[in-house]
Amino acid sequence: MLLSPKFSLSTIHVRLTAKGLLRNLRLPSGLRKNTVIFHTVEKGRQKNPRSLCIQTQTAPDVLSTERTLELADYKTKCENQSGFILHLKQLLSCGNTKFEALTVVIQHLLSEREEALKQHKTLSQELVSLRGELVAASSTCEKLEKARNDLQTAYEGFVQKLNQQHQTDQTELENRLKEFYTAECEKLQSIYIEEAEKYKTQLQEQFDNLNAAHETTKLEIEASHSEKVELLKKTYETSLSEIKKSHEMEKKLLENLLNEKQESLEKQINDLKSENDALNERLKSEEQKQLSREKANSKNPQVMYLEQELESLKAVLEIKNEKLHQQDLKLMKMEKLVDNNTTLVDKLTRFQQENEELKARMDRHMAISRQLSTEQAALQESLEKESKVNKRLSMENEELLWKLHNGDLCSPKRSPTSSAIPFQSPRNSGSFSSPSISPR
């Protein structure tokens, strides 16, 4: 164990101040020399005080100057030493704080070690107790296994006894159920015969009512269907006749317009051809005039040349004027044709729309007629189905009557599978009272 912290710190502080710090200090070279000189000067003063007094008497002036210099040196040395001493004090304080921190850390580690030892002791005690508990638990487990084996043997014997009792009870219950089932079958057979007679009468009444209602509805549907078909035929014929008339009128109008336009275009073509022939004749006459002039003026070449140029210029001007006039006429005609074409295109679009509307009406009338034909076919099929159902019901009624008269339902010699059917007859009695009725 360590000593107390106060005693250890004081002893360590003394040792550091006495030995360690002064040896380990790294002072600069100038300071060490000054300290040595200071110590030697002090020793010389102590040893030779008389020599100093004699020297002071002989040379006072020199001493005064030397003393002033020495005093200045001593002051500088003292200041340096005071700074050095302060630095040493700071180092001592830092070392003391570090050492105190080390002591605190060591004390903390010692306390943790003591706590770890205490925990080790407690854990060892717990291990000992757990070993004892393990031994006790193993002994109890062995005892419980023995008890389980004993209980298993007892349980097997009890189960065997229960199986034997269950088999005996099962045989007794089977015998009782057989007796009860035979008695109930006899009762249910009698009840079934009574209910069959009741349902027979009900079925006959329902069958008669259905036949009457079916005949009335059939007549009504046929009458309404024939009336609808006649009305649709009349409307269809009238609409067809009107559409055909309007279509023929429009067709005639369009044909007349086309013929008129063709005639006008042919007239325009003939006029243009006549104009072209007149222009060709003019050109031929002018050429002949030019030839005659050339023959007459062949003696003067300059005059001939000038006249030829004038005539050529005149011909060119006339040709250009005629071309311009023709182009103006063509433009006027083209504008008229464009206007006529636009009007005709508008009329054609309008007539096409009307034709499309008429076609749509025709398609609608055709669809309505097809619907009516399909409805008529469906009604005929439903009537045929109802007639088949009525026939089937009549056949079933006849079979039931035949069975009742022959006594098939009252036969005592029947298998157990067949006897299960009358057992469910009161619950399923609705099957007789709800025959297949068509929605019509």
Swiss-Prot record:
Keywords: Cell cycle, Cell membrane, Coiled coil, Golgi apparatus, Membrane, Mitochondrion, Nucleus, Phosphoprotein. GO terms for molecular function: microtubule binding. Present in neurons (at protein level). Residues 106-401 form a coiled coil. Its main location: mitochondrion. Belongs to the MTUS1 family. This is Microtubule-associated tumor suppressor 1 homolog. The gene is Mtus1. It comes from Rattus norvegicus. Cooperates with AGTR2 to inhibit ERK2 activation and cell proliferation. May be required for AGTR2 cell surface expression. Together with PTPN6, induces UBE2V2 expression upon angiotensin-II stimulation. The modification Phosphoserine is found at S373, S394, S415, S425, S429, S431, S433, S434, S438. InterPro entries: MTUS1/CCDC69. Residues 425-440 have a biased composition (Low complexity). GO terms for cellular component: cytoplasm; Golgi apparatus; mitochondrion; nucleus; plasma membrane. It is found in: Mitochondrion; Golgi apparatus; Cell membrane; Nucleus. Homodimer. Interacts with AGTR2. Interacts with PTPN6. Transmembrane segments: none annotated. GO terms for biological process: cellular response to angiotensin; cellular response to peptide hormone stimulus; regulation of macrophage chemotaxis. Residues 407-440 are annotated as: Disordered.
